[in-house]
Amino acid sequence: SAQRRAIAEIIADFGKTHPMARLLEGDVGSGKTLVAAATSYAVVNSRPPNRASGTLQVAYMAPTEILAQQHFESFIQYFKHLPINIALMTGSGCKKFPSKVNKGGATDISRAQLLKWVANGEIAMLVGTHALIQKSVQFKHLALVVIDEQHRFGTAQRRALAKKEVRLPHLLSMTATPIPRTLALTIYGDLDLTLLDEMPPG
């Protein structure tokens, strides 16, 4: 399927000597979030370079709080049976899953607490809005940046997220809309292109 092919291309990029910069393009409902979740899972199951333990981290940036909340909830559904800490950070507040007080659900946490957990590597997947690129957000081992609807974010915002790590993280941008700037980026070699050209079954 197109989704399996996309996942395989992205995971192959992870094995290269230079960081991935890939654009995933597909209509609404074509499975972009599933591809992002599967590749995020591959990342957090890898160890940081030259370390015996620890978790690599993923930052998933959405253009609106509503979309960020939806992606956070999708990730909870995908990973609820696995020992993966997922958090949400937006201008309205912060949440963490799993929760000690809300079995099976997420719990509200303070921004200060979340920043601490992101900095010490306890949070493996951080979903949010442009709040993720504020200077106060420091990752321990940021390995993959996923940007949803990438044409809504400027190049400066992409670079701001990438600069949070000494090693440049992999970049997966996603869009439902083929637009001239996106195509120009691909033509000029800034981003490799993967097309989700078929809908998932069902």
Q: Residue locations for each model-derived region?
A:
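Walker B catalytic acidic pair
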Residues: 26, 129-130, 148-149
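Conserved glycine(s) of the Walker
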Residues: 31
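P-loop (Walker A) phosphate-binding loop of NTP-binding proteins
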Residues: 27, 63, 176
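Conserved helix-turn-beta segment of the N-terminal RecA-like "Helicase ATP-binding" lobe
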Residues: 66-109
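Conserved motor-coupling elements within RecA-like helicase/translocase cores
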Residues: 92-126, 134-140
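Conserved SF1/SF2 helicase motif Ia
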Residues: 21, 35-72, 80-84
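Post-DEXD/H (motif II) to motif III coupling segment of the RecA-like Helicase ATP-binding lobe
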Residues: 69-70, 139-144, 149-202
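Conserved pre-motif I regulatory segment
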Residues: 1-25
